[in-house]
Amino acid sequence: ADLDKAVEGAMLAKFRNIGQACTAANRFLVQRSVVEDFTQRVTERVQAMKVGRGTEEGVQIGPLIDDRAVDKAKTLVGDAVERGATVTTGGSPVEGPGTFFEPTVVADVQPGSDILREEIFGPVLAIIPFDDEDDAVRLANDTEYGLVSYVFTESFARGQRMIDKLETGMMGLNVGVVSNAAAPFGGWKQSGLGREG
């Protein structure tokens, strides 16, 4: 995949509306051969994000919906770290008033981590390395949710295979935003049945 496009897509897919959207990506499966470079690039972008009130100039990360959302993000990050993941930036609630959580990158997330099983609904980007296409599909489908997936590849044939193999209702190919008023909206598994639009 074009790493620049993949990083840009990841930023859009994760941090739009602070990750508090049903179409926000939760798990980022990255091929092992480029995972270090991808992690570094995403970490640099996330470190540069400004946190604060939406009325402040240049703010990119605002508050989460409530204290429970902050606690959930903190708990998911903590569990991932206990199981062997590394926080490359962020990882904690922001000190002071409000329900702010630092934009966070968690790398080398291990199988069995809660962050891989639950919807995050917060500014936490979890990176899982994979070895080959079959490994990526297995990891991607290992969830009870299936609303949307985002695939970045330079291979049209691989993109077509992913459409058939990934258990999601929608898929963005080389884009970080999949919602479109002109396209049907819907998911699989616990993300709903059927389509709207």
Which stretches of residues belong to each language-model region?
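ALDH superfamily catalytic-core signature
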Residues: 1-110, 139, 173
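Conserved C-terminal structural/oligomerization subdomain of aldehyde/semialdehyde dehydrogenase
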Residues: 1, 11, 50, 93, ...
